[in-house]
Amino acid sequence: GPSYQRGTDDPSLDEAAMSTGLDRADLEHAMDKWLAAFNASGFVSHLPSGPRTISVLEISNETSEHIGSALRTLITSVETKLVNGGTFDVVANDDVVKSAILTERTRGDMVDPETMSALGKELGVNYFVHGRVGDTTEKTKDARRVQYTLFLKVTEVSTRRTVFQEQIDITKQITG
């Protein structure tokens, strides 16, 4: 019959890729790369004094892969890092905010600038983190490769300017 193992008993369980989807190692790589670039950015080093409020909106899945759950985990990870970093007050991406976004969205899979600005003012948010992930998929007789490109950016609510953006590349392959 099947055998079961805990990752706490065998940490190597998380090392191997099991699919072409995004796993914990991919999300940690993305979070670490984004956070390092974000914290080293001119945007963060030149923040004005006073209250700085940020909220993580959404990361749009523009791939053919079923990675919605992984992207929601990444959103929560970004929120956690921002909360623990102490530079910003974080407005949680909870069901109320999601509902407002879905109700006011006027086009596409991303939140348009007018909606983002209105939500920011309504919620007292200075900056929004949001993004999208796309992919390029190739297949041969015995292999399938997915190259993900994740774009995460920070938009200033009052000006609608993108004040920070980072690209993170992740490649997964299955053979056999």
Question: What is the meaning of each model-derived region?
Answer:
Residues 60, 94, 158:
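Short, flexible active-site-adjacent loop segments at beta-strand->alpha-helix junctions, enriched
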Residues 1-87, 174-175:
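A structural "domain/chain start" motif
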